[in-house]
């Protein structure tokens, strides 16, 4: 009952406490509805942002997974911009090695192996490719330090090359303190310093010796790597393999016993990793082989071996053909599905055999 004569009904706030009302009548639900609407809008906004992020990461991942194209070694050598003589022995091979290292860091997405965030952390094919190219770079840097830059075993090593080798052998998966990219960039700088010394005709503190034994040392390193890659690629389908570790030497021994026969097979989840590692290694090797043909031209011509180097290049070129399949296929033997690993192993095995023949030819006096 509204017994206060000065208070009109429309001035009251809420229900009359003296009158009975159904439970809940007179209370507004506007605040509750507004809260639910705000929470729903926030949730939808978060979903939208997450979807946009995932789509952008997917697009970047596809772009970053594109392998670098082959480059022209002479153009790359000119672009390095050394002020000295660019026609000196070893200049083209050194400039090519530097360009391979720079491409490893400057390709789309940069260096991905040590990434901690999307999309880099989701990718595994490109880090495997980087590992292959890095392996070739490390082997070449070691041969530079021990062979290419030294006249004989008792000669002093070049300090720039000694530092460069250590930088390139730094952990390939370090994100911080120090980061891998920083160490590899330092290695490139040391190689550029060596290149500058080579092109300076007024200085003789750095040399590149284009000799047959030096070339054999580098080919031996490449031979070993190609042989390993060929075996790992061939094991994609699994095969029974005899132990030939001590074959050819009746007096040889080994530290621990191994089975006379064992099944060798690459784990299923590692098949594409081995495939892309092989592509990265052969990509880098192709460029350095082209430079070696130029810098060791006189040595090769004396043995009529220039055509052998060109044949090795010809055997390796198919390893860089476009992979049209969205994934690395692993068909079994002569089955209906292609086996990309076996095709890659075939090309690498032929190139490896040609390198072995070239080494034998160079060793013949």
Language model region names:
Residues 59-73:
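Hydrophobic single-pass membrane-insertion segments
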Residues 74-183:
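N-terminal Sec/ER secretory leader and immediately downstream segment
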Residues 2, 74-79, 273-276, 282-365:
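A cross-kingdom marker for long, charged
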Residues 29-39:
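Cytosolic juxtamembrane amphipathic/interface segments immediately preceding
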Residues 46-60:
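Hydrophobic membrane-insertion alpha-helices, especially the h-region
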Residues 115-125, 171-178, 262-272, 325-343:
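A cross-kingdom feature marking solvent-exposed beta-strand/loop segments within repeated
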Residues 1-30:
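N-terminal intrinsically disordered, acidic low-complexity segments at the extreme N-terminus
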Residues 184-313, 320:
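Extended amphipathic alpha-helical interaction segments
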């Amino acid at each position: 009952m509204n017994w206060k004569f000065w208070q009109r009904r429309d001035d009251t706030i809420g229900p009359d406490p003296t009158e009975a009302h159904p439970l809940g009548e007179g209370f507004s639900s506007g605040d509750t509805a507004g809260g639910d609407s705000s929470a729903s809008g926030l949730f939808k906004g978060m979903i939208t942002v997450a979807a946009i992020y995932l789509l952008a990461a997917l697009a970047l991942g596809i772009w970053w997974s594109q392998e670098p194209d082959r480059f022209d070694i002479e153009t790359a050598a000119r672009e390095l911009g050394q002020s000295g003589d660019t026609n000196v022995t070893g200049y083209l091979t050194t400039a090519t090695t530097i360009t391979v290292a720079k491409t490893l860091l400057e390709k789309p997405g940069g260096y991905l192996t040590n990434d901690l965030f999307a999309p880099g952390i989701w990718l595994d094919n490109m880090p495997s490719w980087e590992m292959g190219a890095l392996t070739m770079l490390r082997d070449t840097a070691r041969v530079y330090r021990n062979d290419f830059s030294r006249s004989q075993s008792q000669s002093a090593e070049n300090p720039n090359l000694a530092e460069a080798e250590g930088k390139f052998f730094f952990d390939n998966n370090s994100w911080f303190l120090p980061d891998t990219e920083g160490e590899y960039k330092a290695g490139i700088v040391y190689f550029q310093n060596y290149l500058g010394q080579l092109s300076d005709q007024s200085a003789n503190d750095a040399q590149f010796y284009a000799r047959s034994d030096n070339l054999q040392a580098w080919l031996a390193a490449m031979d070993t790597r190609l042989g390993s890659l060929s075996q790992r690629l061939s094991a994609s389908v699994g095969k029974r393999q005899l132990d030939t570790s001590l074959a050819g030497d009746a007096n040889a021994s080994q530290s621990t016993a191994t089975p006379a026969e064992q099944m060798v097979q690459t784990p299923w989840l590692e098949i594409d990793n081995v495939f892309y590692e092989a592509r990265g290694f052969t990509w880098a090797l192709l460029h350095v082989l082209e430079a070696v043909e130029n810098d060791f031209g006189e040595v090769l011509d004396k043995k009529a071996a220039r055509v052998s180097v060109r044949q090795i290049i010809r055997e390796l070129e198919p390893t860089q053909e476009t992979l049209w399949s969205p994934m690395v296929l692993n068909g079994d033997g002569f089955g209906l599905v292609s086996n990309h690993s076996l095709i890659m192993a075939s090309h690498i095995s032929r190139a490896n055999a040609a390198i072995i023949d070239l080494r034998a030819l160079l060793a013949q006096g």
